[in-house]
């Protein structure tokens, strides 16, 4: 019953999203030119496209509006499928998702060595970032200027930080009443309020690039 409730709520989030399909399909690091800033994002469970339909494209669009012609947005996909079942794995997501995110950070560093990397995740996507970033070598970690995490499913488990990554480069958004931030997979209405934090997240990232 709990899993059915989670699925119903998450499906409703996607259906209600105002973000159009074109903006969800951001694959610009892989197929586009290098830009001054590269944004890598892992979407929430059941969200479609590369960036999802909420905070991912919200932050991407905010960065692009502030730094016109200087931002490439890249979603962690397609091997990260954002399925519900992977939330229950020990790392909070699949190894395939983690490996894909690691490869994207490596691609940004090798293809675009002068880019400034910023990153983010929402819900299960935060677990992707919590696991991928610590796996990177120090030279790539140093290229990451800021990370924003919404509804962090690894917040309690990792002590309110990304392991082995500077806390001053990380901003975690955990709404009052969002129980996933407290080490559970219980989904409440608070888990769907993070569009309200997008503008602040954009400002946080811009201040670091």
Swiss-Prot record:
It catalyses: cutin + H2O = cutin monomers. Disulfide bonds join 34-112, 60-73, 174-181. Residues 1-16 form the signal peptide. Its main location: secreted. The active site is at residues 123, 178, 191. One of its GO terms (molecular function) is cutinase activity. This is Probable cutinase 1. It comes from Aspergillus terreus (strain NIH 2624 / FGSC A1156). The lineage of its organism: Eukaryota, Fungi, Dikarya, Ascomycota, Pezizomycotina.
